[in-house]
């Protein structure tokens, strides 16, 4: 056989190998997208447009409906805290599958309002599934991803959050025409279907012995930079609260435009959330995660501040879409930055990501309660909320700039 034949065969084998590599990678990304859509998009964000219906149909009093929303935040924090222990006990892939099943069950269980305690317990569990999925999904897939594709693949994974936000403003109102019970059952069925479709799409999990064999203690500087990154991520959570919690109410009651107009801006927020992770992930692959993160904080600070200065429709549209884009779009940037700071240990990467997710959950809960308290005691001053959110994003940018300077000196 001639040398040209050998080269041709090698070329075909190489092409086939790369094709096999590419196909599972996108399959893994779609599994991650399904997980974030089920555990975060549907189990969490779909609850927001259900609140008026829960009150109108007399399932719960207005104050109880608010507490049920808080139950999800508490569960999310708990999920972030237990995720690594659960993965160590039964494996990350098994944990993700169990959490997706549990999230589906939570929606089905909420179809019957047996009591406040019953509903509260299931909403806590729904939040817990989201916390576990947020910690484990991407950190399970990204070790199988080439360095120049980590941003894009991370963006695909977290686009599920954006799809859930968009569904909360479009699909859920349509389902509510059939009734509350039917809506919860449909959300549960959709979650179960996504769980089934992604069941065999996850990567084969590596044994922990490999991670232990390659484990090297993190340097002090890297640890300090990761701590600073966690603080930035927490402040970013506070920056998102004004739009996530108050945007619809601001348009509907603050501007007197009604709930229909408020819901329209929420749909715009959701549309931004769909494309946000893909755009930020692509930017990170081109420019690096550090520069992309700093750019994101700067743009976000401006976008969050806009409603404090103008209520013009064009301004509110831009603000809704941009902040919506960064709600899930910031996630692949922070996760990718962790992989840059801790390049050689998947165990340390997962630990740092769990720490960052916990910081986000804690700051988000504190921010939601704190801004709600401030809003009530300010006589309903919406501008204050957006100003505080913008200041939090600016604070995250300041910390990241200090971290960048510190990293260059090492």
Predicted feature locations:
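Helix-breaking motifs and short loop linkers at transmembrane-helix boundaries and internal kinks
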Residues: 59, 91, 112-117, 256, ...
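Paired small-residue
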Residues: 117-126, 314-322
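Conserved MFS/SLC helix-loop-helix module at the cytosolic interface between two early adjacent transmembrane helices
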Residues: 78-114
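A late C-terminal transmembrane helix in Major Facilitator Superfamily
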Residues: 346-379
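Intracellular juxtamembrane helix-capping segments at the cytosolic ends
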Residues: 132-145, 329-343
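Cytoplasmic helix-loop-helix junction between adjacent transmembrane helices
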Residues: 122-160
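Extracytoplasmic gate region of multi-pass secondary transporters
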Residues: 48, 226-267, 277
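Helix-loop-helix hairpin linking two adjacent transmembrane segments in secondary transporters
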Residues: 116, 147-149, 155-203
């Amino acid at each position: 056989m001639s040398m040209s034949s050998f080269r041709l065969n090698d070329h075909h084998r190489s092409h086939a190998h790369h094709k096999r590599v590419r196909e599972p990678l996108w399959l893994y990304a779609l599994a991650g997208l399904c997980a974030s859509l089920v555990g975060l998009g549907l189990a969490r964000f779909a609850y927001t447009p259900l609140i008026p219906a829960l009150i109108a149909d007399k399932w719960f009093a207005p104050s109880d409906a608010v507490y049920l929303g808080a139950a999800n935040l508490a569960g999310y924090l708990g999920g972030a805290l237990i995720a690594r222990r659960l993965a160590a006990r039964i494996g990350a892939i098994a944990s993700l599958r169990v959490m997706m099943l549990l999230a589906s069950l939570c929606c089905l269980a909420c179809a019957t309002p047996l009591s406040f305690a019953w509903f509260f317990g299931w909403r806590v569990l729904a939040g817990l599934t989201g916390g576990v999925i947020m910690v484990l999904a991407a950190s399970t897939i990204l070790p199988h991803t080439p360095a120049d594709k980590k941003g894009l693949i991370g963006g695909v994974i977290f686009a599920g959050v954006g799809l859930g936000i968009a569904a909360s403003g479009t699909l859920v109102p349509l389902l509510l025409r059939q009734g509350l019970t039917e809506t919860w059952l449909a959300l549960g069925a959709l979650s179960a279907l996504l769980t089934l479709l992604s069941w065999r799409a996850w990567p084969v999990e590596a044994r922990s012995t490999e991670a232990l064999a390659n484990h090297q203690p993190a340097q002090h500087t890297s640890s300090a930079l990761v701590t600073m990154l966690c603080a930035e991520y927490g402040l970013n959570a506070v920056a998102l609260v004004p739009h996530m919690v108050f945007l619809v109410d601001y348009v509907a009651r603050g501007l007197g435009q009604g709930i229909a107009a408020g819901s329209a801006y929420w749909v715009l927020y959701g549309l931004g959330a769909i494309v946000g992770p893909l755009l930020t992930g692509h930017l990170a692959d081109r420019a690096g995660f550090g520069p992309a993160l700093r750019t994101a904080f700067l743009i976000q600070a401006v976008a969050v501040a806009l409603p404090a200065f103008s209520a013009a429709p064009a301004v509110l549209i831009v603000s809704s879409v941009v902040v919506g884009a960064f709600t899930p779009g910031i996630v692949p940037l922070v996760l990718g930055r962790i992989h840059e700071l801790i390049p050689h240990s998947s165990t340390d990467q997962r630990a740092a990501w769990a720490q960052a997710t916990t910081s986000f959950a804690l700051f988000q809960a504190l921010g939601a309660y704190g801004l709600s308290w401030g809003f009530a005691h300010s006589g309903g001053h919406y501008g204050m909320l957006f100003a505080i959110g913008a200041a939090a994003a600016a604070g995250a940018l300041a910390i990241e700039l200090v971290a960048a300077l510190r990293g260059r000196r090492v």
